[in-house]
């Protein structure tokens, strides 16, 4: 909707020790050891005084309030709000059809001229009910079309994606330069993932002193384009170098963000370490290792929003707490009914995930027999690759009453699965951060996960969940057997649930290292100005 206008427990300690003892040699199996050496969480060295709010612009391709394809949208919506008590944080997003037709009034507040083959566009402003300000990049020819932000209805990349997201990056640079006529300019720009990767680059090419942060949410998505498109996007020749944007004969929008930002972050400490190795580096491990040696790469764990509260969540059949598990049992009963599972008191395992290879769903199919043989039940919710979807359906047919599956996704069933299950399965081959394991712990469902990325950083093995190392069915099966062993000891299961629910995953805690980083970069900018 466009609107014309202008805009300026004592016993608990003993129980935890017992948990460790049970998990040390479960069913005769040795306890797993870390595949990646543990990485210390970032130490907070600078705390915001809150006295002087700084102006910060987030640049992102999706935002949960308006358009979402994955976890980037959740972070893009939650992190600015969490930081909003300390700073003036605003968000820039393309004006997709979903945004324009969201029902939120959009006031036109600025305009931008064309550059190279990037068209001119207008800037709209949405004022969300909670006070978050969103700038919308309005260009119908680039953004107002059916499909997702990145692909058409057939799942094919939009052919003009380089132009669409270069326009986003350039708009951020022009807003930072104060040339967008919106009566507001940021003191720091925070760009997210490859669609916003050119924002720090255009800022550099235009000689701006405004510091920038670039966050890698998933290194596997790189925004690689043909070298021939350089002139269309107004990319200078100097950028076509291995130390800048060049990547195996192409140009990478993700690498542009890494190369030109003042600081690079990713979404967990372990993932920050992993992406400097050949196994997880996706061809950029050398470049990222250099950034790490220079002290310019940090891993900052994501958080979750305040809506994940089991006592008051309106999506649940019944709320519950660590003092009263009746509500959890009510949600388990719903899950069994909705997924066609036998109504019996059995260990209930859940999958809430995209059904894709990265998430290790094929490994879950391999260990499902061990779950059923161990007396457990399995409920699967998700969608993704058609072959894996078909295999999930076949599994449910193979084990009627013990395995149930819904292909698709809805928030109500997802939250009730977290609340009703005993264990959440996350055998990801890699997981930059992951949020589901945090949701599960808040709702007393113990995650069983591979020790990788944010899973390693947010799950305490044998205390709040179960970790395994190798991405294979044998290691995964051992972790499942450990969980089944704990389920036979109700006092241990209860203690682990209580510990998991107490984990401090909310964004109000997670913003501290972001605030410290912003203050550091803004302080460095001030020092440079004083020297000049």
Where is each model-derived feature located?
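Short linear segments in intrinsically disordered or otherwise low-structure-confidence regions
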Residues: 4-6
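Catalytic cores of nucleotide-sugar-dependent glycosyltransferases that transfer UDP/GDP/TDP-activated
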Residues: 2, 12-532
């Amino acid at each position: 909707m466009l609107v014309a206008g202008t805009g300026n427990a004592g016993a608990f300690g003993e129980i935890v020790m017992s948990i460790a003892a049970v998990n040390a040699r479960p069913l005769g199996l040795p306890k797993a050891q870390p595949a990646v050496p543990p990485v210390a969480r970032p130490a907070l060295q600078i705390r915001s005084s809150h006295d002087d709010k700084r102006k910060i612009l987030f640049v992102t391709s999706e935002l949960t309030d308006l358009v979402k394809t994955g976890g980037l949208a959740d972070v893009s919506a939650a992190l600015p709000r969490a930081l909003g008590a300390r700073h003036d944080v605003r968000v820039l997003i393309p004006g997709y059809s979903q945004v324009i037709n969201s029902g939120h009034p959009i006031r036109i507040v600025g305009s931008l001229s064309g550059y190279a083959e990037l068209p001119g566009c207008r800037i709209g402003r949405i004022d969300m009910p909670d006070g978050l300000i969103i700038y919308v990049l309005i260009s119908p020819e680039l953004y107002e079309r059916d499909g997702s932000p990145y692909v058409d209805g057939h799942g094919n990349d939009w052919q003009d994606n380089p132009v669409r997201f270069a326009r986003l990056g350039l708009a951020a640079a022009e807003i930072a330069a104060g040339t967008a006529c919106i009566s507001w300019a940021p003191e720091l720009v925070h760009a997210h993932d490859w669609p916003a990767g050119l924002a720090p680059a255009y800022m550099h090419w235009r000689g701006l002193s405004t510091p920038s942060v670039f966050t890698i949410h998933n290194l596997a998505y790189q925004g690689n384009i043909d070298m021939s498109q350089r002139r269309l996007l107004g990319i200078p020749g100097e950028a076509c170098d291995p130390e800048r944007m060049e990547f195996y004969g192409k140009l990478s929008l993700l690498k542009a963000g890494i190369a030109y930002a003042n600081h690079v972050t990713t979404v967990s400490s372990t993932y920050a370490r992993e992406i400097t190795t050949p196994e997880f580096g996706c061809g950029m491990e050398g470049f990222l290792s250099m950034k790490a040696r220079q002290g310019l790469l940090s891993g900052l764990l994501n958080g979750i929003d305040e809506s994940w509260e089991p006592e008051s969540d309106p999506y649940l059949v019944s709320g519950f707490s660590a003092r009263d598990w009746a509500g959890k049992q009510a949600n388990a009963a719903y899950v069994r009914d909705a997924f066609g599972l036998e109504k019996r008191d059995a260990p209930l395992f859940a999958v809430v995930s995209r059904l894709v290879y990265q998430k290790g769903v094929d490994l879950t199919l391999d260990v499902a027999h061990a779950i059923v043989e161990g007396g457990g039940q399995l409920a699967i919710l998700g969608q993704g690759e058609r072959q894996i979807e078909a295999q999930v359906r076949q599994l449910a047919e193979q084990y009627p009453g013990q395995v149930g599956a819904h292909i698709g996704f809805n928030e109500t069933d997802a939250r009730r699965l977290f609340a009703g299950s005993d264990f959440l399965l996350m055998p990801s081959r890699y997981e930059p951060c992951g949020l589901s394991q945090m949701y599960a712990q808040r709702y007393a469902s113990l995650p069983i996960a591979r020790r990788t990325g944010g899973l390693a950083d947010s799950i305490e093995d044998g205390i709040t969940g179960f970790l395994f190392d190798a991405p294979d069915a044998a290691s995964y099966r051992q972790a499942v057997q450990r969980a089944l062993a704990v389920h036979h000891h109700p006092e241990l299961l209860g203690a682990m649930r209580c510990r998991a629910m107490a984990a401090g995953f909310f964004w109000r805690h997670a913003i501290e290292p972001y605030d410290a980083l912003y203050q550091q970069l803004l302080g460095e900018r001030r020092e440079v100005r004083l020297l000049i």
